[in-house]
């Protein structure tokens, strides 16, 4: 059977989180009543002239710098001409041959792999969003309504080279891209609200060939999982067509998430179908290098840079660093807690396991989490200083969730400080040995897990307050080192 290679390129549209639209002063707030955020410019009324939003331009430059793009110092806007009910002017203001950013790329790592992968970018350009069609849910009333609140919202379109060879690569590419955009705070990347949208261009070719096959563009991809599923389905469909000797036209398809298949929408238009030409209402943009460098100075530490620092400077495992740096707010929370606790690994464990566990379960952001980074740092410091055990820390944490008290106050009020009285601990250890002779026998026969039962007895009697390190030390002195297994 013939073997094929998959070729994938992605086009990502990210709404820029500006207060107003790209060419007018209308607001961009999501969820407002239909057609309540419009003005003559975004309605396409005669005589209404566009004026570029400087903040949108700056955010586009920042995105380009974050992905290592070259910034075009001489750029312009073009009219992309087509008819659709949600496009009141009959054209979209976009960029054709002089995009604001060219080149660059996205670095990502597939889960379970050590080496990073890199996908080149073709360009990033600025454009305005279209409105939104709302179709009647009643099949007996075949009507559609137009909401132009979204029309004119600033977008960047991030176009990749066809460098991806699997749906997994596409999935992790998108995750990395989203992480960077959120880190630099140019977009909230909320797919449910439509502020991040993706189209996938998919083709196949015989392995070893350098000629591209017929390309299919897939739209209506409302999640990264949908992107992965749509690519997998489309690749199998194209392979079947090739093996049966059938051909097909370049076309645009929709992803049907109910039927889990791609459905043909239309034959694909080419760029000449849009009759691009420079927008006569907008002057060309001549950027100064100083302007670009000013934007560069505002760039925060990016996810990969931060991840590497967590591994190299803080000594965290790679997995911990990946979890903590996936979102800027989580990484900030961790570092704020670490400033108080002074113990990177213990702080990492608490943030990624306990705190993110609650955040994910309750479907909230870490900024909405009820316990501040400072209070978590104080709790971890008590553990790191040996004042409380991990088990007691979880009891304290439960109270932190519902109380404004700090960890040390809770520990003091409940008398939870670890017992360091050697004589008292030795008394409990002797009692544990006397009452757990079966475990002692197993330990002396080489079964190291048996020691856990004795330690557990000590912790139970001391109500978790005995110093675990001291308990283990005393047990080893009294029982001797673990003998070799016979």
Swiss-Prot record:
Keywords: ATP-binding, Ligase, Nucleotide-binding, Protein biosynthesis. Disulfide bonds: none annotated. It catalyses: L-glutamyl-tRNA(Gln) + L-glutamine + ATP + H2O = L-glutaminyl-tRNA(Gln) + L-glutamate + ADP + phosphate + H(+); L-aspartyl-tRNA(Asn) + L-glutamine + ATP + H2O = L-asparaginyl-tRNA(Asn) + L-glutamate + ADP + phosphate + 2 H(+). SMART domains: GatB_Yqey (SM00845). SUPFAM superfamilies: GatB/YqeY motif, Glutamine synthetase/guanido kinase. GO terms for molecular function: asparaginyl-tRNA synthase (glutamine-hydrolyzing) activity; ATP binding; glutaminyl-tRNA synthase (glutamine-hydrolyzing) activity. Signal peptide: none annotated. Its EC number is 6.3.5.-. Allows the formation of correctly charged Asn-tRNA(Asn) or Gln-tRNA(Gln) through the transamidation of misacylated Asp-tRNA(Asn) or Glu-tRNA(Gln) in organisms which lack either or both of asparaginyl-tRNA or glutaminyl-tRNA synthetases. The reaction takes place in the presence of glutamine and ATP through an activated phospho-Asp-tRNA(Asn) or phospho-Glu-tRNA(Gln). Belongs to the GatB/GatE family. GatB subfamily. PANTHER family: GLUTAMYL-TRNA GLN AMIDOTRANSFERASE SUBUNIT B MITOCHONDRIAL AND PROKARYOTIC PET112-RELATED, GLUTAMYL-TRNA(GLN) AMIDOTRANSFERASE SUBUNIT B, MITOCHONDRIAL. This is Aspartyl/glutamyl-tRNA(Asn/Gln) amidotransferase subunit B. It comes from Leptospira interrogans serogroup Icterohaemorrhagiae serovar Lai (strain 56601). The lineage of its organism: Bacteria, Pseudomonadati, Spirochaetota, Spirochaetia, Leptospirales.
């Amino acid at each position: 059977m013939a073997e094929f290679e998959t070729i994938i390129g992605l086009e990502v549209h990210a709404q820029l989180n500006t207060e107003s639209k790209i060419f007018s002063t209308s607001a961009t707030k999501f969820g407002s009543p239909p057609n309540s955020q419009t003005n003559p410019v975004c309605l396409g009324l005669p005589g209404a002239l566009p004026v570029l939003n400087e903040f949108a331009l700056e955010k586009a430059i920042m995105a380009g710098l974050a992905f290592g793009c070259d910034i075009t110092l001489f750029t312009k806007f073009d009219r992309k001409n087509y008819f659709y009910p949600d496009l009141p002017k009959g054209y979209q203001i976009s960029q054709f041959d002089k995009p604001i950013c060219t080149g660059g790329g996205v670095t990502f790592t597939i889960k379970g792999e050590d080496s990073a992968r890199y996908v080149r970018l073709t360009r990033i350009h600025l454009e305005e969003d279209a409105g939104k069609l709302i179709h009647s849910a009643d099949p007996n009333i075949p009507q559609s309504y137009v909401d132009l609140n979204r029309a004119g919202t600033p977008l960047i379109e991030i176009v990749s080279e066809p460098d991806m060879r699997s749906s997994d690569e596409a999935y992790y590419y998108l995750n990395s891209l989203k992480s960077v955009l959120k880190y630099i705070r140019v977009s909230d990347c909320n797919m449910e609200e439509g502020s991040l949208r993706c189209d996938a261009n998919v083709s196949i070719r015989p392995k070893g060939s350098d000629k591209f096959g017929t390309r299919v563009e897939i739209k209506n991809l409302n999640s990264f999982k949908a992107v992965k599923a749509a690519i997998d389905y489309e690749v199998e469909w194209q392979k079947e067509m090739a093996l049966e000797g059938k051909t097909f036209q370049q076309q645009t398809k929709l992803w049907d998430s109910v039927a889990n298949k791609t459905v043909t929408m239309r034959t694909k238009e080419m760029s000449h179908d849009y009759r691009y030409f420079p927008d006569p209402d907008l002057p060309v943009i001549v950027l100064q290098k100083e302007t670009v460098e000013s934007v560069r100075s505002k760039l925060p530490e990016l996810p990969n840079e931060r991840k590497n620092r967590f591994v190299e400077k803080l000594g965290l495992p790679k997995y911990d660093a990946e979890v903590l740096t996936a979102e800027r707010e989580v990484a900030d929370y961790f570092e704020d807690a670490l400033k108080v606790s002074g113990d990177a690994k213990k702080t990492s464990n608490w943030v990624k396991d306990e705190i993110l566990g609650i955040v994910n379960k309750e479907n909230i952001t870490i900024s909405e989490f009820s316990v501040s980074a400072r209070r978590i740092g104080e709790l971890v410091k008590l553990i790191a200083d040996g004042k409380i055990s991990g088990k007691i820390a979880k009891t304290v944490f439960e109270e932190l969730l519902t109380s404004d008290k700090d960890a040390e106050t809770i520990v003091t009020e409940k008398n939870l400080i670890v017992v360091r009285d050697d004589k008292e601990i030795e008394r409990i250890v002797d009692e544990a040995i006397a009452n757990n002779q079966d475990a002692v026998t197993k330990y002396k026969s080489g079964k190291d897990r048996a020691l856990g039962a004795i330690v557990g007895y000590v912790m139970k009697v001391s109500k978790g307050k005995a110093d675990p390190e001291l308990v283990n030390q005393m047990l080893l002195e009294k029982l001797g080192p673990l003998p070799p297994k016979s």
